[in-house]
Amino acid sequence: MAAPLRGYPRAWSGGTSGPVTAEVAFAPLFPGPDPIEFLDLARLRKNVENFIQANRGKLKGKIVLLDRLREVEVPSKEPLATRYDDAKLAELTKDVEPRVPAHWTWPLESVPLEKEERDALMRTLPLEVREDFWERHQRVQLSLYEFLRSEGVAGVLMTDRRGPGGILFAESTGGFFTDAGLPPPVLVLTPESYNRVLRLFEHGLNPRVTIDVQATFDSSDPHGYNVVAELPGSKKRDEVVMLGAHLDSWHSGTGATDNAAGCAVALEAFRILKALKLPLTRTVRIALWSGEEQGLLGSRGYVREHFADPVTMKTQAEHAKLAGYFNVDNGAGKIRGVYLQENGMVRPIFEAWMAPLRDLGVTTLTNRDTEGTDHLSFDAVGLPGFQFIQDPLDYRSRTHHSELDTFDHAPAGDLLQAAAVLASFVYDAANRPEMLPRKPLPPALPPKREPSLSSPR
């Protein structure tokens, strides 16, 4: 019998040049059912080395199953979409332990497998050390795919451990590096489809799978581009308030909640300020970033070019002229407050700015930092960069990096509220007598010591 499988190719996957049918081979990358060691670079590298040694010369012409069976979760009793109530917002305001610098080396090779310890370490790492870790992590993954390509595999099937099942999360092979080799066709299947193929194989039924991946690589322009525009200020036009969101997204959906929603909110806030012809003492600059999903590349590059080197901490003249940066990238929900990034000096200022917005549900300030988006590029060099607290809706449960990230999950009312709040914050920052207070400029990073590691290829 024949049955369809639900899947999607990973970004920068190779193509098939038409339909390809082949037998499957089961070659799991990790020894256990829960590959927690995937998060640790040293362990991942060792697993890839072991995989290459064990499978060299054995996989030609096969469609390779890389993952073990994925247990599909019983549907949770928690709602798939939520809004913050007063209790949840109050929980966010509870004090957390301040970041205590942990011992780390650069380049970082290992992280704790225990989640709390790992999260604590990641919170203390300088942004450049953290992003360097994930870049090298991507390169180790890519070395696996390059090996499989060199072995002549017909394709690779995987699944993903996020979500309750039934949803596709297809991200990257890591092949976006300009010096990367071409990966084979790599597809992510829903857990149900993947498990079905693997069970047939385990029962000795020798299933055959047909895949057809149409992929074109264009290397004529390897650059990403930020989109930047300004509303000129008046008396202090050389000082700048920035707002922004990232323009890139993953491909299995349309990127509606991550992060077309943030771009739409930023653009609408910019339009409001322009249409109302409000007086602006400082210049207002909007930036829609590229390459956020590959490591905040657009915003990190912009900060390095205009404000400061995040390694040496050598500042440029513009560093002293940035009044603040406001980022929108937590889905399509209403704005409920601000993460202060441990900059308690802005609390009384933001409290005053939020007072007329309380009837819109903007009530909460938390001293906590939040991770994973472009305000970190500014915060990393001592600039006031902030991300808003937003109603979760179904962002983390269903749409984040998934095939469900479509227009249907971006409520217009939430986006309009967020745009009004963002416009108000930017207007206040542009006209405040003083610029926003800053945390101290971080110290320069120590010299990076490249490890003497052999390639796993």
Regions found by a protein language model. Give the residues of each.
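Surface-exposed loop and adjacent secondary-structure segments within mature catalytic domains
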Residues: 75, 79-112, 159-190, 202, ...
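Noncatalytic luminal/extracellular "stalk/propeptide" segments of secretory-pathway proteins
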Residues: 1-120
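Acidic/histidine-rich catalytic neighborhood of metal-dependent amide-processing enzymes
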Residues: 143, 147, 223-226, 249-349
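Solvent-exposed loop/turn segments at secondary-structure junctions
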Residues: 31-33, 70-73, 161-165, 193-194, ...
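Structural recognition of the beta-strand scaffold that forms the well-ordered cores
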Residues: 63-67, 154-159, 186-189, 227-230, ...
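Protein/peptide-recognition domains central to ubiquitin and immune signaling
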Residues: 1-20, 135, 145, 153-178, ...
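Active-site-adjacent substrate-binding region
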Residues: 119-133, 137, 145, 149, ...
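Soluble metallo-hydrolase cores and metallopeptidase-like ectodomains found primarily
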Residues: 15-50, 174-256, 268-271, 275-281
